[in-house]
Amino acid sequence: MSAQDNLTINEKKVLLALEELGSAAPDKLEEKSGLQVDAAMQAAFMLQEKGLASVSEKVLERYSLTKEGEEYTKTGLPERQIIDALKAPAPLEELRSRFSPKTVGIATGWLIKKGWAKVENGVMVPSGNAPAGRDEEVLAAFAGKAKTLEELAADEGTVKELLKRKLVIKHEEKSRTVSVTGAGSALAAEGIVLEEEIAQLTPELLKSGAWKGKKFRPYRLDIAPNPLYGVKIHPYRRLIEQMRQIFLEMGFTEIKGGIIQSSFWNFDALFQPQDHPARDMQDTFHLGSICQLPAEYSDKVAAMHESGGDIDSCGWGGIWDRELARRNVLRTHTTSVTIKYLADNPEPPVKAFCIDRAYRRETIDPTHTPEFEQLEGVVMDKDMSFADLLGLLAEFYHRMGFEEVRFRPGYFPYTEPSVEPEVYVDGLGWVELGGAGVFRKEVTEPFGIKEPVLAWGLGVSRLAMLKLGLKDLRLLYQSDIDWLRKSEVCRI
């Protein structure tokens, strides 16, 4: 395809006009090309993209008088009105009776600033020297028209002062000039043929046969079209849904619970000591309300904390504080939801999971936020073992696309044994994604649970960062439209 074939009929007309004019303003280009000014400028911009023309833009600043400024060209500035009438010292009260209070108020400051007069004990005393100022000369130079600094023969400081006094206003006028480039002149010299082209074959053209013998505008297939961004689910929401589906397919029941939990269910029921650092104000959102303790469980949990209850345990010792257990908090983990579910369903089998938000007092940075999602789950049945827990978690991570999974020993107050699952990520190595273990008898015994309970709490947002290739956790919660548009729906 020749360079000329790549031009529309309007572009050809504008290029021919520019070849003759060299450069032109939009109105001259309109006149020479025979096109409307909008069509001519659209063609000029297209020629600029192709390197055949250039469009330069100049911003011209003009100034015009405000209504107040126009009034002062007739009456004189307030300070001029006062000084011309002031033949001898006069009290300010007398001036206010002769002129409007507004005029006297404005004039007083300017008379002193310009050195035309001074005020002594409430009396205006003229200095006897009040030559015409540049501001007065500039106001007179407008003559009722908008003008540039050059046309006013004014310095920028004087005009800036008049702007502050709101006697003039500034207008910005944009002017464009279109010029032909060397490449444009060379193409025009080859001879440009003006021939109407059909850009789109319509049903009317087909029916009438008017397309016969006409030239069709060629299409360039090497130009990428504008990207089309379809509607799609937020990447983070899509990953959460993927996790849900995995556990539902594995036969689990999804459970939910309130974000406000008592300290009893959030901490004490999980055999977390009442002096544990996680319960401090700097780690937990404590609320100003309290609740009633569950009568059927509170005494058993108290006994377990104080002395180990009826099992082979010594508990934490000391006196269990019931008032502390009654205090409401924003749940720091969703384990409070699963332990309540187990208390309501103490007989096997139980397979339940929860994906929901938890809250902790965290400083916001690329890897921490005070709100985050957690994937919690439990399995309670006869003959369940620690090996079953490892196999279940490995299966989950494999289904999420991680080929290598390993487990490291861990410690949590309410599970024994405990592990931390890790996955291998190219470029990062092994990454820890949560905690898991078998609930201790100190947790299950007060609720009448006799069978082993496998439990885990996995970090959802950290897993999402790995899957989405993010280094900043905050992007998951921000409305970055560009990132959302370009995020992958799936990887084939």
UniProtKB/Swiss-Prot annotation:
Molecular-function GO terms, alphabetical: ATP binding; magnesium ion binding; phenylalanine-tRNA ligase activity; tRNA binding
Protein known as: Phenylalanine--tRNA ligase alpha subunit
Co-factor(s): Mg(2+)
List of residues binding L-phenylalanine: 335, 374-376, 414, 439
Keyword Iron-sulfur: no
Recorded name of the encoding gene: pheS
Subcellular localization, as worded in the UniProt entry: Cytoplasm
Record's subunit section: Tetramer of two alpha and two beta subunits.
Originating species: Methanosarcina acetivorans (strain ATCC 35395 / DSM 2834 / JCM 12185 / C2A)
